[in-house]
C-alpha cells in the first residue's frame, strides 16, 4: 500500500502519541527503584542544559534509580498533575512512589547525586561509565 503524505503524517502522529503515552505510563508505573522525574520542555534553555545530565544519569545509574523526562509543553496536563510552578522541576520519588523532594530550575549532576544521598539513597559511582 502506497503511503500518501496525509497517511504518512497520520502514521507519524500515531507513533508519536503512542511513544508519549508509553513514557507517561512509565512515569506513573509502580517503580522498583527510586525515581527522578524531570518536568521540562524541549525548547526551554535550562531544560536543554539538563538533557545531557539526564542522559548520563540514565546510562550510568540505571541500576540505582530511574530517570523520566516529561515535556510539559507537549503533555500539558502533566504540569498540573505534578503541581509544578516552573520548568525545569525535578521531583525525587522513593521506590514506593512517595515524593521525597523537589527542586526548581537547573540542577547539576553532582547536586542530583548529592540530593539522592541526602535522601538516604545509596548512590555509587559506576565502575566504568557508559560511553556517550
Residue ranges and their predicted role:
Residues 2-3, 15-16, 116, 123-132:
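Non-globular targeting/processing and membrane-anchoring segments
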Residues 10-21:
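Bacterial N-terminal signal peptides
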Residues 94-127:
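Non-catalytic, surface beta->alpha helical segment in thiol-disulfide oxidoreductase systems
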Residues 48-60:
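Typically the conserved alpha-helix immediately C-terminal to a functionally engaged Cys/Sec
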Residues 82-91:
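Structural micro-motif
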Residues 39, 63-76:
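Thiol-based oxidoreductase modules, predominantly thioredoxin-like and allied folds used
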Residues 23-34, 76:
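A short beta-strand-turn-helix
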Residues 35, 40-43, 86:
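Short pre-active-site segment immediately N-terminal to redox-active cysteine/selenocysteine motifs
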Amino acid at each position: 500500500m502506497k503511503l500518501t503524505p496525509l497517511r504518512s503524517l497520520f502514521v507519524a502522529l500515531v507513533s508519536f502519541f503512542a511513544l508519549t503515552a508509553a513514557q507517561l505510563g512509565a512515569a506513573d508505573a509502580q517503580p522498583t527503584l527510586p525515581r527522578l522525574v524531570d518536568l521540562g520542555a524541549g525548547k526551554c534553555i535550562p531544560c536543554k542544559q539538563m538533557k545531557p545530565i539526564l542522559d548520563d544519569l540514565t546510562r550510568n545509574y540505571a541500576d540505582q534509580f530511574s530517570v523520566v523526562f516529561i515535556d510539559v509543553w507537549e503533555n500539558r496536563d502533566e504540569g498540573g498533575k505534578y503541581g509544578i510552578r516552573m520548568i525545569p522541576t525535578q521531583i525525587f520519588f522513593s521506590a514506593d512512589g512517595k515524593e521525597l523532594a523537589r527542586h526548581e530550575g537547573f540542577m547539576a549532576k553532582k547536586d542530583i547525586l548529592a540530593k539522592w544521598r541526602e535522601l538516604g539513597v545509596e548512590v555509587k559511582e559506576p565502575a566504568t561509565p557508559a560511553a556517550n
